[in-house]
């Protein structure tokens, strides 16, 4: 079966491992179509061709790059006519233009199609997005939901077709792995350079966008309440960076807070093991709640303990392999950090649990196999 996947998320090199795993499976000829870059309020990300073995990775220009709702690929029709897929996998929400455009083109060329959704809030969209959504519900042979709550949203809005819960991407446990003893020794002997945290401190890490809903301001307040020697590494970019740096100055902790900026996904497996804990302090918004928290499974795969806000899908991702605090509770987060800073054996235990949970649920190979099963079901029916 010939499958074409269209995904702006695949500009991230680490995410391409899922496609390498898919391409290994029997009976599939896989092509991915991605934009040369994607930019939004968190910054500009160019395509990183990191994992491209076994399938074809094509680029296609976007119109309205950076607009989640309105972007689309004007040359997609020509590409589909050349590739003649049996299945078109639009890795997009059903309410956006790219998904509607892709599913319409798939219907015209006789291909079955499916979409992906993270949407775990029952939002109502104005026209034309409500029109796109309902049209895609009718055209799609299947849907993939990133979490269980997204299925309930689909059903409440009228989707009656088959749907399966599969996270969008997993992690490769051979790449995201704990540091070896030799690597830990090397890291411990390194001198901090520039804005890198000292290896002698209890190191708290955050990875993700610097946007209000990610709650990095809460993390700064929580860290300001810590005693002893500690440092905070903030990995990522976004419009809040200046405000967060100013907040660190006001709190008197600027010397312990290190803004690392954006790093390629290929560097993350070497960064996470340097941290003693990763924190995801997200806060809900009327139009958004955490849908998965991918950085959690990346850190867990590296044997790094995690702390997250009790919001959205985060408790289901962590299970019993990390600590939770009530959303917005600075004191609760400070207490969780203090407990881990004082107890190395507890950190090691949570790190082991986290990696075991990833190996059981969230590897790229497992997610690729589940996705392949969906493709086979569609192919048999159509």
Range-by-range predicted roles:
Residues 4, 187, 193, 197-223, ...:
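Conserved donor-binding/catalytic core segment of Leloir-type glycosyltransferases
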Residues 8-11, 94-97, 105, 109-127, ...:
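A short, histidine- and acid-enriched strand-loop-helix "catalytic/donor-clamping" loop
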Residues 102, 320-330, 339-345:
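Conserved acidic donor-binding segment of nucleotide-sugar-dependent glycosyltransferases
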Residues 134-185, 259:
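Donor nucleotide-sugar binding/catalytic pocket of nucleotide-sugar-dependent glycosyltransferases
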Residues 243-266:
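Nucleotide-activated donor-binding/catalytic signature segment of Leloir-type glycosyltransferases, i.e.
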Residues 256, 273-289, 304:
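Acidic donor-binding loop of glycosyltransferase active sites
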Residues 262-263, 270-275:
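Short alpha-helical donor nucleotide-sugar binding micro-motif in glycosyltransferases
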Residues 298-308:
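Short hydrophobic beta-strand element within catalytic cores of glycosyltransferases
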């Amino acid at each position: 079966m010939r499958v074409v996947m269209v995904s702006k998320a695949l500009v991230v090199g680490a995410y391409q491992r899922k496609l390498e795993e898919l391409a290994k499976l029997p009976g599939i000829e896989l092509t991915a179509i991605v934009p040369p870059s994607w930019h939004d309020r968190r910054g500009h990300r160019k395509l990183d061709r990191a994992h491209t073995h076994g399938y074809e990775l094509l680029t296609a220009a976007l119109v309205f790059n950076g607009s989640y709702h309105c972007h689309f690929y004007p040359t997609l029709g020509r590409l589909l006519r050349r590739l003649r897929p049996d299945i078109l996998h639009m890795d997009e929400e059903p309410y956006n233009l790219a998904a509607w455009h892709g599913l319409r083109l798939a219907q015209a060329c006789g291909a079955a199609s499916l979409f992906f959704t993270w949407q775990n809030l029952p939002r109502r969209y104005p026209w034309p997005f409500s029109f796109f959504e309902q049209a895609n519900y009718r055209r799609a042979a299947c849907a993939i939901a990133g979490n269980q709550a997204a299925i309930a949203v689909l059903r409440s809005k009228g989707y009656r077709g088959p749907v399966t819960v599969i996270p969008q991407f997993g992690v490769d446990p051979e790449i995201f792995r704990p540091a070896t003893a030799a690597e830990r020794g090397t890291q411990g002997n390194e001198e901090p350079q520039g804005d890198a945290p000292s290896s002698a401190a209890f190191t708290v890490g955050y990875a993700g966008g610097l946007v209000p809903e990610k709650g990095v301001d809460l993390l700064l307040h929580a860290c300001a309440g810590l005693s002893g020697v500690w440092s905070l590494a903030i990995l990522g970019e976004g419009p809040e960076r200046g405000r967060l740096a100013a907040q660190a100055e006001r709190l008197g902790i600027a010397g312990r807070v290190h803004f690392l900026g954006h790093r390629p996904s290929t560097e993350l497996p070497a960064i996470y093991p340097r941290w003693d804990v990763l924190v995801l302090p997200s806060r809900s918004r009327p139009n958004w709640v955490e849908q998965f928290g991918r950085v959690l499974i990346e850190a867990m795969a590296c044997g790094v303990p995690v702390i997250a806000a009790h919001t959205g899908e985060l408790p289901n991702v962590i299970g019993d392999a990390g600590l939770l605090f009530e959303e917005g509770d600075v004191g609760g987060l400070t207490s969780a950090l203090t407990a881990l800073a004082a107890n190395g054996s507890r950190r090691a235990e949570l790190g082991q649990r986290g990696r075991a949970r990833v190996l059981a649920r969230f590897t790229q190979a497992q997610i690729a196999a589940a996705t392949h099963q969906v493709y086979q079901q569609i192919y048999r029916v159509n």
